[in-house]
């Protein structure tokens, strides 16, 4: 039920209505509302009940096991949120003077240094407001670097066929042509194809390591040498940093620039389209091109660096300092765990993934790459289940919802047929993993004996299978368009 269906003329929550509304605003008259907004007329109790019930119908990290591959749905520690909400942080105005913001600036400066140490890259900018924007910033810096050298013939970005969809999107937005590199049968990049396609037009290559196949790219040093010898740069998509945190640094692997997804590796909140934060880290040669602002330290304290400090900067990507509240959460998460704790993150993440992969193969599931160990995530292929029992990966995913488990990522990467990409983050216990295995075993038995149960799933949720194509092509967000 939509909240408009609860509406009744004259009903209102008076406690929430301001006694007087000031009209001393500077909105031009042509932009001022001429009629009252068409809001639902509901009591406060109705509103509270409605949205509380909606929240109870959602799947979330706080309520359900959430093995969504390539998303690192780890628990967000409440103490971190509390620390980031200290009055000195949340009451600071974005335009406050540097000398009135020394504590805030010092915190961000330390965060820059922590990220530099974690990534093995000397330059860090915190300003991008999402992983995708950080990715765009990284590719834009690659372009600025080549242009500053007069190397304008480099108009190609190499991208593996198993890459995240944002990779080619960022490359195209920066004016590059995307050149796809195939994956070899063992899950690594096809080096022979890379050798054929890298050349004088190569601006760079975008990689995730471990890849979205859940496999560590074993020839990364050779790849780095090939691209660098051709004059290109290496971009690291930080989506899977959780798998190698504290073990190996992207800078040490030969990468020149990367973005970090704070909502994945560093436990800031997911969802809702934001707020997000996607800091970028760069090697020495790209420091001049970093997006502003960044925090610098001088004898007089901490200050915002300006265009005078970075005249070749690609510019600003956001107002002020990006999403400061999210950056603070990542900083306190690092403080809470410390160096040893961050190392344990990757150890437990990879342990969980390999344990779960082993247990699921014991109950009949097929690993997409049975000869390889998982990193922090892995892929099951349900191709045989589809051929033998006419049930799909989507059927398995929908049935999991009936058992109170959020579905893994389905049909991604596209090169693995009928796949589930499963990522059990380090915050999940062995008991939770064992419970998931038991559910998966039950669902597979249902697929064999009663496949129609899977085909009609979910059975217990208020919403069944939606028409995704219709929703995408016939966007309807106006209640009154169909109810008048």
UniProtKB/Swiss-Prot annotation:
Keywords: Oxidoreductase, Pyridoxal phosphate. Disulfide bonds: none annotated. GO terms for cellular component: cytosol; glycine cleavage complex. GO terms for biological process: glycine decarboxylation via glycine cleavage system. The modification N6-(pyridoxal phosphate)lysine is found at residue 264. Its cofactor is pyridoxal 5'-phosphate. It comes from the Bacteria. It catalyses: N(6)-[(R)-lipoyl]-L-lysyl-[glycine-cleavage complex H protein] + glycine + H(+) = N(6)-[(R)-S(8)-aminomethyldihydrolipoyl]-L-lysyl-[glycine-cleavage complex H protein] + CO2. SUPFAM superfamilies: PLP-dependent transferases. Transmembrane segments: none annotated. GO terms for molecular function: glycine binding; glycine dehydrogenase (decarboxylating) activity; pyridoxal phosphate binding. Its EC number is 1.4.4.2. Belongs to the GcvP family. C-terminal subunit subfamily. The glycine cleavage system catalyzes the degradation of glycine. The P protein binds the alpha-amino group of glycine through its pyridoxal phosphate cofactor; CO(2) is released and the remaining methylamine moiety is then transferred to the lipoamide cofactor of the H protein. This is Probable glycine dehydrogenase (decarboxylating) subunit 2. It comes from Legionella pneumophila (strain Paris).
């Amino acid at each position: 039920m939509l909240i408009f269906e609860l509406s009744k003329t004259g009903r209102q929550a008076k406690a929430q209505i301001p006694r007087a509304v000031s009209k001393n605003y500077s909105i031009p008259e042509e932009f001022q509302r001429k009629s009252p907004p068409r809001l639902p007329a509901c009591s406060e109790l109705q509103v509270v009940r409605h949205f509380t019930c909606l929240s109870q119908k959602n799947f979330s990290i706080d309520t359900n096991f959430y093995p969504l591959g390539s998303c690192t749905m780890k628990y967000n520690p409440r103490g971190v949120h509390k620390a980031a909400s200290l009055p000195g942080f949340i009451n600071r105005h974005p335009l406050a003077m540097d000398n009135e913001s020394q504590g805030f600036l010092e915190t961000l400066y330390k965060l820059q240094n922590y990220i530099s140490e974690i990534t093995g890259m000397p330059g860090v900018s915190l300003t991008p407001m999402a992983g995708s924007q950080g990715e765009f910033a990284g590719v834009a810096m690659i372009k600025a670097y080549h242009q500053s050298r007069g190397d304008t013939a480099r108009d190609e970005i190499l991208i593996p066929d198993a890459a995240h969809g944002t990779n080619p999107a960022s490359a195209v937005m920066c004016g590059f042509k995307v050149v796809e590199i195939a994956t070899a049968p063992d899950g690594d990049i096809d080096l022979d194809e890379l050798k054929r396609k890298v050349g004088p037009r190569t601006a760079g290559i975008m990689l995730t390591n471990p890849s979205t196949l859940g496999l560590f790219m074993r020839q990364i040093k050779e790849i780095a040498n090939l691209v660098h010898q051709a004059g290109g740069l290496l971009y690291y998509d930080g989506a899977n940093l959780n798998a190698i945190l504290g073990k190996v640094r992207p800078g040490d692997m030969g990468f020149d620039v990367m973005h970090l997804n704070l909502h994945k590796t560093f436990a800031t909140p997911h969802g809702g389209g934001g707020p997000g934060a996607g800091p970028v880290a760069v090697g020495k040669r790209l420091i001049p091109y970093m997006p502003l602002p960044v925090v610098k330290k001088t004898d007089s304290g901490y200050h915002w660096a300006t265009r005078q400090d970075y005249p070749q900067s690609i510019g600003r990507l956001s107002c002020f300092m990006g999403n400061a509240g999210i950056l603070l959460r990542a900083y306190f998460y690092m403080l809470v765990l410390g160096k040893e704790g961050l190392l344990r993150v990757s150890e437990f993440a990879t342990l969980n993934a390999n344990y779960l992969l082993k247990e699921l193969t014991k109950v009949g599931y097929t690993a997409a790459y049975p000869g390889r160990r998982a990193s922090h995530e892995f892929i099951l292929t349900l191709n045989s289940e589809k051929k033998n029992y006419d049930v799909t990966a989507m059927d398995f995913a929908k049935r999991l919802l009936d058992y109170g488990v959020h579905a893994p990522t389905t049909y991604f990467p596209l090169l693995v047929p009928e796949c589930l990409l499963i990522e059990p983050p380090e915050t999940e216990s062995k008991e939770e993993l064992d419970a998931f295995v038991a559910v998966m075993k039950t669902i597979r038995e249902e697929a064999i004996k009663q496949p129609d149960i899977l085909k009609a799933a979910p059975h217990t949720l208020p919403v069944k299978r939606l028409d995704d194509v219709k929703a995408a092509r016939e966007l309807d967000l106006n209640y009154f368009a169909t109810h008048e």
